[in-house]
Amino acid sequence: MADPRRPARVTRYKPPTTESNPALEDPTPDYMNLLGMVFSMCGLMLKLKWCAWIAVYCSFISFANSRSSEDTKQMMSSFMLSISAVVMSYLQNPQPMSPPW
């Protein structure tokens, strides 16, 4: 039995680019980055420990869902802001976090 494949018709796979179709880009890292910054500011200004911890969580999600080709400066600044919110909230009040309800 002969090989039915035609070598002249074989084409190499090229993944679709996000420049041609912006709907393929996932907005989750950007949203989590923004949420992380908002929660870390609330944690710093209002001294809410649970806001600071949610900011750290959002920063981790943003980092985990980001692409390697993206600029990491904004992500790292958001992460450092959330860590500083946790540190500052525990430096001002070292007691364990009380439930928000």
UniProtKB/Swiss-Prot annotation:
InterPro entries: ASTER (IPR005351). GO terms for molecular function: protein folding chaperone. Residues 1-27, 66-69 are cytoplasmic. The chain crosses the membrane at residues 28-46, 48-65, 70-90. It is a multi-pass membrane protein. One of its GO terms (cellular component) is endoplasmic reticulum membrane. GO terms for biological process: multi-pass transmembrane protein insertion into ER membrane; protein insertion into ER membrane. Residues 47, 91-101 are lumenal. The keyword Membrane applies. Induction: Up-regulated by FGF. It is found in: Endoplasmic reticulum membrane. Keywords: Chaperone, Endoplasmic reticulum, Membrane, Transmembrane, Transmembrane helix. Belongs to the Asterix family. Component of the multi-pass translocon (MPT) complex. Component of the multi-pass translocon (MPT) complex that mediates insertion of multi-pass membrane proteins into the lipid bilayer of membranes. The MPT complex takes over after the SEC61 complex: following membrane insertion of the first few transmembrane segments of proteins by the SEC61 complex, the MPT complex occludes the lateral gate of the SEC61 complex to promote insertion of subsequent transmembrane regions. This is PAT complex subunit Asterix. It comes from Gallus gallus (Chicken).
